[in-house]
């Protein structure tokens, strides 16, 4: 869990900025969204395959240029 302690003389805005950066670096938001609802194994597989197709199409387009 991301934790930020206020340093002496530090403004709350700076501490909040450090906290947000730490949360992004640790991918906490992504994990929370991933665990917010249950996906059946078949649905997980379909999502994974769709992402793989999307990546391969993107890679093919990039190679054409």
From Swiss-Prot:
Keywords: Ribonucleoprotein, Ribosomal protein
One cellular-component annotation, GO: ribonucleoprotein complex
Gene Ontology biological process terms, A to Z: translation
Record field: compositional bias (Basic and acidic residues): 43-52
Source taxon at top rank: Bacteria
Family matches, as Pfam families: Ribosomal_S21
GO MF term (any one): structural constituent of ribosome
Stretch list, region Disordered: 43-65
Compositionally biased spans, kind Basic residues: 53-65
Protein name stated in the entry: Small ribosomal subunit protein bS21
Gene: rpsU
């Amino acid at each position: 869990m991301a934790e930020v302690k206020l340093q002496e003389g530090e403004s709350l805005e700076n501490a909040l900025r450090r906290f947000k950066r730490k949360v992004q670096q640790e991918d906490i938001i992504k994990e929370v969204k991933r665990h917010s609802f249950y996906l059946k194994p078949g649905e997980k597989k379909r999502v994974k395959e769709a992402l793989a197709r999307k990546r391969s199409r993107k890679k093919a387009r990039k190679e054409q240029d």
